Design a protein with these regions (language model features):
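The two-metal-ion catalytic cores of nucleic-acid processing enzymes
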Residues: 1-488, 492-499, 503-504, 508-589, ...
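Long, K/E/R/D-enriched contiguous segments that form extended
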Residues: 624-625
Length: 625
């Protein structure tokens, strides 16, 4: 396939490039009233040289497919062979207009625009003849990149970041974004602990600390601290931190500190930069730069990014307190991917209830046995710590980042996320969302088989306000106590070794086992007098007419037949056993005991009618019963 989307067209096809990052910038209205064009930036690594490259595309295009013979399509198809569709390329911002033109629905399209009902045009993607038109634009370019270049997975370089803020003069209990100066930042990359410190004329301990750094005392103390916090050489080698170097920089002006920090990041170009709870660090730095009178893009972005550079961080407020479901992401125009390490950790372990807290200290203790530095023997107020013991304050910041390193070295979450992103052609913000990455993988897998997938027609459908009331739930009070666990001899509603016949799980399991899907269904074979009894049996069960249910569905006698059989049984006179009773004493057969019966009471009266109180007999066994 030709590189018609102009993705890294300076490289030949099948060149050893691997996609790292994608940025899509939506159009926005400028001060002059005109709208900008959207843009897409792709970052890839040359695996032959290790160098990274950026591909900036203004007004990115989309390739979708239209059925050649739409009249043959009687319903929505999950896929069609490539030879039955034709590819259509158009600007992504005009995708729905292009679909409307190609399918003869321009009137529908223009009416929606005129009425301000822009979302209604999304229904154009549900047309039977339209295929592969509903993929996210970033994932779409990842898909075509994967078909143009090798896109093989290699090891990645990881960096770590944490900031501290001077909160001694803030108004509330917690600083607002950009409210107070950033006084300490630690950035760890390539075996070097880089610590940036803001000088403070109000705090003489900062100058004292600087003198101790110059004398080498701080580095010696730091190595002792690492051994105390993490362990001996064996433990340090386990987490790949043995022999870390220490580099401290002091600044008189805060903007110089921040500028130097991001210059170093953009010079070293680590593949990933992580912070624990990045939703605080990066938005705070962005706003702090603004408060200091500078544009964040001029400080944080790499100079190679010329087309619409951005320094933004998006917080998923819908899932703000559910870390496993949060979709935060950073849009910082650079060769480095900024990721929230806490969200990645929680998302990868979604559904596991082992972690009651995702605080750095708690996760560090559970995962790798490394915790934050405890300063409470000095003060319980972090705002006072730099004025009481500045060295401990700095070391507290450094140990925080070391805990991050130990967690990642123990879990390799970022390696997993990177692999998933490359293998599934999925942007990092959605790499944990199963419906999205499986859909992207399906698109790629089917395309390799010569098939073009259809669209997800459920996206535009209104979701029902109430769930379908189709399940039959038995009264739990009818569950036998024999299967229940007992507490102090009292059975509770808790079962061990429970088998849950959950249809919501059963149906997908059956589909997977028999490789079923809607496109593989040719039709339904109906036999003569064959009835679909699934709904009827549920309706009968709900009526609780047990005799009717037993007769109709399980071949048991109805009421009249039951009475006849019972009356025949109990009107037959004396009951006798077919074999004699055998009695054993200490394992030896002894003389059988004689069993005496009273005459059975006839079940039928002299009038031939049923006496309901007479359907039983009496017998007297030796010893009495």
């Amino acid at each position: 396939m030709a590189n018609i989307l102009n993705i890294f067209n300076q490289f030949p096809k099948n060149y050893d490039l691997t996609i790292l990052q994608t940025f899509f910038a939506k159009p926005f209205k400028q001060e002059n009233g005109k709208w900008t064009k959207p843009s897409l930036s792709l970052v890839a690594k040359d695996n032959n040289t290790g160098k990274k490259h950026v591909c900036e595309i203004e007004d990115p295009e989309y390739i979708w497919f239209l059925a050649k013979d739409p009249d043959k399509l009687t319903h929505h198809y999950d896929f069609l062979p490539k030879d039955e569709v034709e590819a259509i390329q158009c600007p992504n911002r005009e995708l729905e207009k292009c679909i409307a033109q190609a399918t003869g629905n321009m009137k529908f399209f223009t009416n929606n625009i005129a009425n301000g009902e822009y979302r209604e045009n999304a229904k154009l993607h549900t047309l039977n003849q339209v295929f592969f038109s509903d993929q996210n634009i970033e994932d779409h370019y990842r898909f075509w990149f994967n078909r143009l270049f090798k896109n093989e997975i290699h090891s990645v370089r990881k960096a770590y970041l944490d900031i501290e803020v001077d909160i001694s003069d803030i108004v509330g209990d917690f600083p607002e974004p950009g409210e107070a100066p950033v006084n300490v930042v630690t950035y760890i990359n390539d075996g070097v602990i880089n610590t940036y410190i803001l000088r403070d004329p109000k705090n003489p301990l900062v100058q004292e600390f600087e003198n101790q750094v110059a004398s080498g005392e701080i580095e010696r103390d730091l190595r002792k601290l690492i051994e105390f916090a993490i362990g001996d050489e064996t433990r340090q080698r386990k987490f790949n931190i043995f022999g870390y170097n220490f580099n401290v920089k002091f600044f008189d002006q805060e903007i110089q500190l921040l500028g130097s920090l991001f210059r170093q990041i953009n010079t070293e170009e680590p593949d990933f930069l992580m912070a624990w709870n990045m939703a605080f660090d990066i938005p705070y730095l962005i706003q702090r730069i603004r408060n200091l009178g500078y544009r964040p893009e001029s400080i944080m972005c790499h100079p190679d990014f010329k087309l619409n550079p951005k320094a933004e961080y998006f917080i998923d407020t819908r899932m703000e307190n559910n870390y496993a479901e949060r979709g935060d992401y950073a849009y910082i125009s650079a060769y480095t991917v900024y990721l929230d390490q806490m969200i990645q950790f929680a998302s990868r372990r979604k559904g596991q209830s082992a972690f009651a807290s995702f605080k750095l200290n708690d996760i560090g203790a559970q995962i790798c046995g490394v915790q934050k530095l405890n300063y409470h023997h000095i003060t319980t107020d972090l705002a006072k710590l730099p004025f009481l013991d500045f060295k401990t304050f700095v070391f507290y910041n450094i140990v925080d980042v070391l805990v991050q390193v130990c967690i990642e070295e123990s879990t390799d979450d970022i390696g997993y996320i990177y692999n998933s992103s490359v293998l599934n052609n999925t942007r990092f913000s959605k790499v944990h969302r199963q419906t999205i990455y499986l859909r992207n993988k399906q698109i790629d897998f089917y395309f390799n088989l010569g098939l073009v997938v259809g669209n997800n027609i459920n996206k535009t459908r209104e979701k029902p306000s109430e769930k379908f009331d189709g399940a039959f739930v038995a009264d739990p009070n009818l569950v036998n106590d024999s299967v229940k666990l007992k507490i102090n001899g009292i059975p509770v509603f808790l079962c061990d070794n429970l088998v849950d016949f959950d249809f919501s799980s059963l149906y997908p399991s059956i589909n997977r086992e028999f490789n079923l899907s809607s496109p593989s269904e040719i039709g339904k074979i109906e036999f003569e007098d064959d009835k679909d009894a699934s709904s009827a049996i549920i309706e009968d069960i709900v009526t609780q007419d047990h005799l009717t249910i037993g007769h109709r569905w399980f071949g048991l006698p109805n009421y009249s037949e039951l009475v006849d059989q019972v009356s025949t049984l109990f009107a037959s006179g004396r009951l006798s056993t077919e074999n004699e009773f055998k009695v054993y004493n200490k394992g030896k057969l002894v003389k059988p005991l004689e069993v005496e019966y009273n005459e059975c009471i006839p079940a039928l009266t002299r009038f031939g009618s049923m006496n309901m109180n007479a359907i039983y007999g009496e017998r007297q066994m030796p010893g009495g019963l």
